[in-house]
């Protein structure tokens, strides 16, 4: 089973396209929607929904994946639920770059201070990070610097921030999922 979390643009047709691409490596792809506007509510909702779909599945190796803000949540929720994560161009600091776009961006900072101390050290090797060199939203050299001590980082030479096409990374995802 692959759990897919959308980014900030929850209505993008690219979400459906990514789900179709993910179905090439796993028939069971679950899309979990969340508001993107209320971080504390989103965290509670995502924890509940992800836990529920894990319980419903008989897959011994489920993974959670997301793009942008969905990558932010995939890393945290996957860690808290004990499953591996694959993140594409994750937004590591929504408390800084979502100001004016969501109601309470400061809640992301509050979530970070209440999260398990040094969770990335405890999650080491359980997240695959795919970063685009052509990301027009974030400086992914900073993202790589923040994550490379904990996770494998794969660079993509073509895709933009929204990562419309993930098919070139599906076999790496499948191998990571089943390892």
Swiss-Prot record:
InterPro entries: AB_hydrolase_fold (IPR029058), UPF0227 (IPR022987), UPF0227/Esterase_YqiA (IPR008886). It comes from the Bacteria. Pfam families: UPF0227. Belongs to the UPF0227 family. This is UPF0227 protein VS_2073.
């Amino acid at each position: 089973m692959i759990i897919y979390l959308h980014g900030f643009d929850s209505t993008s047709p690219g979400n459906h396209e990514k789900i179709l691409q993910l179905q090439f490596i796993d028939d069971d792809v679950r899309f979990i929607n969340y508001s993107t506007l209320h971080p504390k509510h989103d965290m509670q909702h995502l924890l509940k929904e992800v836990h529920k779909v894990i319980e419903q599945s008989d897959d011994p190796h489920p993974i959670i994946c997301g793009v942008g803000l969905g990558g932010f949540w995939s890393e945290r929720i996957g860690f808290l639920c004990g499953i591996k994560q694959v993140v594409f161009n994750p937004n590591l600091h929504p408390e800084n770059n979502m100001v004016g776009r969501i109601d309470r961006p400061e809640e992301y900072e509050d979530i970070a201070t209440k999260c398990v101390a040094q969770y990335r050290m405890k999650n080491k090797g359980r997240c695959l990070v795919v970063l685009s060199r052509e990301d027009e939203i974030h400086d992914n050299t900073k993202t790589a610097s923040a994550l490379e001590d904990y996770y494998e980082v794969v660079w993509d030479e073509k895709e933009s921030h929204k990562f419309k096409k993930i098919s070139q990374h599906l076999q790496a995802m499948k191998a990571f999922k089943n390892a």
